[in-house]
Curated annotation (Swiss-Prot):
EC identifiers of the protein: 2.7.1.6
Pfam families hit by this protein: GalKase_gal_bdg, GHMP_kinases_C, GHMP_kinases_N
InterPro entries: Galactokinase, Galactokinase_bac, Galactokinase_CS, GalKase_N, GHMP_kinase_C_dom, GHMP_kinase_C_sf, GHMP_kinase_N_dom, GHMP_knse_ATP-bd_CS
GO terms under cellular component: cytosol
Xref: HAMAP family: Galactokinase
Domain of life of the organism encoding this protein: Bacteria
Stated name of the protein: Galactokinase
Length: 387
């Protein structure tokens, strides 16, 4: 598949720019198995890469010009001056790739421009890190073409800075690290404080199970308000408890910490979610490493309840997916991603895939909702050069 995609993207690059690209790169979207809204609290996460990916054909320029083109937009390439790139200067889709060049230059790397053609199969607005895939694929291309010598986690940090400062979205580090560092057949157990990581084998098919992603097709944007409010509330909780981040509140001390927060009810809810979610990540790692994979289903259900009731970022469509899937025999289910729409994941026996899928589709139809998009999530390769 990689060669075919590279050929198509390379051919379009030639049509646009009249020359061969110097290379073609790919970076995947991700789904988060467990560990939601913990990354900006220095906590634990456990994503894996999807087969859906952003692909970029790229060549260097030496005249300070950056030209960007997307296969999704019927328009000529957007032309920008590298020296003029600045936070807030770009409000369109091009902010994600141009922000990467800005972040690399801010970090002291001399980049003299590029011609870029981008194509992506990562669903936008589905909570599957379409923006991170765009950032990481261009960062990897720049790293290779300009021989910057940066490692995956370093590229992820720069991409996060691009999205935080240049785009203005207060995202954590998980999405970019997952896209840059995941390995096929594994979930990534990531400590977001120091970016230490462990690849955990995750082969559901070998155990007779599947993980479905259900895209509700309800769109959301991290840049709009609610995500930032949750992050600010978590930071307030850490300050009130006298810790650097909520990751520093031990699970065993949670009740005492909640008592100390007194009548700060909203902050109490946010703190409870983050501390218990970190514990859930560690529990899932232990279950997978001990071979008790089916037992992670119950942990997913716990996580959804916490996101719905404490963090309050679910929505009726996500709850409908989870409730319907569980009623139809799924082993576990929860919302995934930033919330307020997007996707849910469903752990199901292989023999039950069709029944659960039909039940969810029928439930959406009965509720008068747009048909959800359902697909199997297979742990796939992280960012890499195709050609």
């Amino acid at each position: 598949m990689g060669e075919a995609v590279a050929g198509t993207v390379g051919e379009r690059f030639r049509e646009l720019y009249g020359a061969e690209p110097e290379g073609v790169w790919a970076a995947p979207g991700r789904v988060n198995l467990i560990g939601e809204h913990t990354d900006y609290n220095d906590g634990f996460v456990m994503p894996f890469a999807l087969p859906h990916q952003a692909v970029a054909a790229v060549s260097r320029r030496d005249d300070g010009i950056l030209r960007l083109h997307s296969a999704d937009i019927d328009a000529d390439p957007v032309e920008l001056r590298v020296a003029d790139l600045a936070p807030g200067s770009d409000k369109s889709w091009t902010a994600y790739p141009s922000g990467v060049l800005w972040a690399l230059r801010e970090a002291g790397h001399e980049l003299t421009g590029a011609d870029v053609h981008l194509a992506s199969t990562v669903p936008s607005g589905a909570g599957l890190s379409s923006s991170a895939a765009l950032e990481v694929v261009l960062a990897l291309a720049m790293n290779d073409l300009y021989a910057l010598g940066l490692r995956g986690w370093q590229l992820a940090r720069l991409c996060q800075r691009a999205e935080n400062v240049y785009v203005g979205a207060p995202v954590g580090i998980m999405d970019q690290t997952a896209s840059a560092c995941c390995e096929a057949g594994h979930a990534l157990f990531l400590d977001t404080r120091d970016l230490s990581q462990r690849q955990i084998p995750f082969d559901l098919a070998a155990e007779g199970m599947r993980l479905l992603v259900v895209d509700t097709r309800v769109k959301h944007s991290h840049s709009e308000g609610e995500y930032g409010k949750r992050r600010a509330g978590c930071e307030k909780g850490a300050a009130l408890l006298g810790v650097d981040a909520l990751r520093d509140v031990p699970y065993a001390d949670l009740d005492a910490a909640l008592e100390r927060l007194g009548d700060e009810e909203e902050v109490r809810r946010l703190v409870r979610h983050v501390v218990t979610e970190d514990e859930r990540v560690e529990r899932v790692v232990a279950l997978l490493e001990s071979g008790d994979t089916r037992a992670i289903g119950a942990v997913l259900v716990e996580g959804h309840a916490s996101l719905r009731d404490d963090f309050r970022i679910s929505c009726p469509e996500l709850d409908l997916v989870v409730d319907t899937a569980l009623a139809s025999g799924a082993l576990g289910a929860r919302m995934t991603g930033g919330g307020f729409g997007g996707s849910a994941i469903v752990l199901v026996e292989a023999a039950g895939v069709d029944a659960v899928t039909k039940a969810v589709e029928d439930a959406f139809a009965a509720a008068g909702l747009k048909a959800p998009r359902v697909f199997e999530a297979v742990p796939s390769a992280g960012a890499r050069r195709l050609v």
